[in-house]
């Protein structure tokens, strides 16, 4: 039997930051000194009209198969003797087994990361695993409501395939989930948390603690719901293993340091490394590889894998393989991080934690 218990706020001396709430609107706190605000129409036009894209995404599938291989897998392939293993399913979707508890982050299988099926960012690398081939899932975490992180069809299908699943979401998303028919019957299928709150998930007598954590970002799905739903990162803490997922985020270094001090070290972090150029436009919302390496260090990750790249064209201007190449270059140069690992993996490749 598995169930989430009631949430509890952080009680340590130095608490995590809280979002600012103005009526229906959530905002990043003033302590996020790298937050530059929401890009206005002038900046959006400047991005479209003046910036040159260096993405150079190949149109030839054979080239993509070579540069970004996808290993098709099923639930039967997702196994290991390790107490922690994971596979990247594309973009920000990671399937994790932590001490026998299986969960997924930001499940997105959509062909387009958009409100419509005929426009918007079109997926150029397929998921390595069909929704129907997922193992039985215990829970899922959602970082925010942007279409490349929250796929309504996938959420509904996963719930139908896994009636026992629990969803952990930041403030404001529980109502959206209910509108999709998830938890609409009054069940405890959906647990909604604020930054610095946690919930315990119990399976076969084993307790997993799930933390909702600060992230520097925003939210929106329609024309009139900007920041009506909060954004967050997540930590999943087992008896012996720890996992961290920042979601989408700019570089809020003070909070990353707190996360590392309070909840680290992490055996695995899945850290975004893509969709970051031009910096004048993207810096507030997305870390780049340089900042991702600093996040890896600040949260005290023993191992990290790079995500949020190589899946959808996100309207940014960096070369499509630059996130991977830049990350390797940066890590090769960091003598202070030689005892840790921060790498990229192929979609469908099984990553396993080593014995400690």
Swiss-Prot record:
Positions contributing to Zn(2+) 2 binding: 148-149, 248, 308
Gene knockout outcome: No strong phenotype in the nape-1 deletion mutant, however its overexpression alters growth and lifespan when grown at 25 degrees Celsius compared to 15 degrees Celsius.
Gene Ontology process terms (BP): N-acylethanolamine metabolic process; N-acylphosphatidylethanolamine metabolic process; phospholipid catabolic process
InterPro entries hit by this protein: Metallo-B-lactamas (IPR001279), NAPE-PLD (IPR024884), RibonucZ/Hydroxyglut_hydro (IPR036866)
An example Gene Ontology CC term for this record: neuronal cell body
E.C. no: 3.1.4.54
Short name of one Pfam family: Lactamase_B_2
Residue sites binding Zn(2+) 1 per the record: 144, 146, 217, 248
Binding site for an N-acyl-1,2-diacyl-sn-glycero-3-phosphoethanolamine: 147, 286
Cofactor, free-text remark: Binds 2 zinc divalent cations per subunit.
Cystine pairs: none
Tissue: Expressed in interneurons that are in close proximity to the primary sensory neurons. Predominantly expressed in the pharynx but can also be found in cell bodies of the dorsal and ventral nerve cords.
UniProt GO molecular function: N-acylphosphatidylethanolamine-specific phospholipase D activity; zinc ion binding
Keywords: Hydrolase, Lipid degradation, Lipid metabolism, Metal-binding, Phospholipid degradation, Phospholipid metabolism, Zinc
Main EC class the enzyme belongs to: hydrolase
Cofactors demanded by this protein: Zn(2+)
Catalytic reactions of this protein: an N-acyl-1,2-diacyl-sn-glycero-3-phosphoethanolamine + H2O = an N-acylethanolamine + a 1,2-diacyl-sn-glycero-3-phosphate + H(+); 1,2-dihexadecanoyl-sn-glycero-3-phospho-(N-hexadecanoyl)-ethanolamine + H2O = 1,2-dihexadecanoyl-sn-glycero-3-phosphate + N-hexadecanoylethanolamine + H(+); N-(5Z,8Z,11Z,14Z-eicosatetraenoyl)-1,2-di-(9Z-octadecenoyl)-sn-glycero-3-phosphoethanolamine + H2O = N-(5Z,8Z,11Z,14Z-eicosatetraenoyl)-ethanolamine + 1,2-di-(9Z-octadecenoyl)-sn-glycero-3-phosphate + H(+)
Family to which the UniProt record says this protein belongs: Belongs to the NAPE-PLD family.
Described purpose of this protein according to its UniProt entry: D-type phospholipase that hydrolyzes N-acyl-phosphatidylethanolamines (NAPEs) to produce bioactive N-acylethanolamines/fatty acid ethanolamides (NAEs/FAEs) and phosphatidic acid. NAEs are bioactive lipids that are involved in diverse physiological processes such as growth and lifespan.
Protein name: N-acyl-phosphatidylethanolamine-hydrolyzing phospholipase D 1
Species of origin: Caenorhabditis elegans
